[in-house]
From Swiss-Prot:
Its main location: membrane. It is a multi-pass membrane protein. The keyword Transmembrane applies. The keyword Chloroplast does not apply. Belongs to the ATPase A chain family. Gene3D superfamilies: ATP synthase, F0 complex, subunit A (1.20.120.220). It comes from the Bacteria. This is ATP synthase subunit a 1.
Length: 247
């Protein structure tokens, strides 16, 4: 069977430079991240600002309204300050996920270092803006209102642990779902190839895994959107903590 993990290997394309003894390389992951950025930029430029929206403009406007409504619902009107960040994260993750479904491409969100970097960006934004806007009142985030004094110390410890584990849970959710989905697709596609090589009987038997592969591909398209949405809405919820730490 073809190795289902091989699709996630990082391959160096060329060396950019060195920091000390550490090589800085341009990899296939870097290339597909740049591709996602180029596709997003191209879509935005192609959209235009026509009074009667075309295909690209309709997609961009729909994406804009979707993210804006999600942010307003989760973080209120003040949350729109972070719209550029949230919209960029949603589009980058969604486009990267969609590109990764195409055969022989690379799924950047299937690498924990990529998803953790995005989650860490959100985490640091929450901390920096939280202290900038609220000062020491930001610590209210760790002291929920209405908690009996007897168990308050325990609750505070739990809240602190929960807060600092956010980058891990935020990143692992996206990484694990994309990794598992692509491994499953690769396994069923391998069954199709193996059975197809066994002659007529094998080709007939390959119809079942082929059908499952097609169905799983459709499911992965939905997962590509859902995982981008989940990452985005969690980002909005975390940003709301920076804006309203006492709520």
């Amino acid at each position: 069977m073809i190795d289902p993990i091989h699709q996630f290997h990082l391959n160096k394309i060329f060396t950019i430079g060195h920091i000390g003894n550490q090589e800085i390389a341009f990899t296939n992951s870097t290339a597909y991240m740049l591709l996602a950025v180029v596709l997003i930029a191209g879509m935005m430029l192609a959209a235009g600002r026509a009074l009667v929206p075309g295909r690209f403009q309709s997609v961009v406007e729909l994406s804009y309204e979707f993210v804006a409504n999600t942010l307003r619902t989760s973080a209120g009107s003040h949350g729109m300050t972070f719209f550029p960040l949230v919209f960029s994260l949603f589009m980058f993750i969604f486009v990267s996920n969609i590109v990764g479904i195409i055969p022989y491409t690379f799924t950047v969100s299937s690498h924990i270092i990529v998803t953790f970097s995005l989650a860490l960006l959100v985490f640091l934004t929450v901390i920096i803006y939280g202290f900038y806007k609220n000062g020491l009142k930001f610590f209210k985030l760790f002291v929920p209102s209405g908690i009996p004094a007897v168990i308050l110390p325990l609750v505070v410890v739990i809240e602190i642990i929960s807060f600092f584990s956010r980058p891990i849970s935020h990143s692992v959710r996206l990484f694990a779902n994309m990794l598992a989905g692509h491994v499953t697709l690769k396994v069923f596609a391998s069954f199709v190839t193996m059975l197809g090589a066994l002659g007529f009987v094998g080709k007939v038997g390959a119809l079942l895994p082929l059908g499952l592969t097609v169905a799983l591909t459709g499911l992965e398209l939905m997962v590509a959107f859902l995982q981008a949405y989940v990452f985005t809405i969690l980002t909005c919820i975390y940003l709301n903590d920076a804006i309203h730490p006492g709520h």
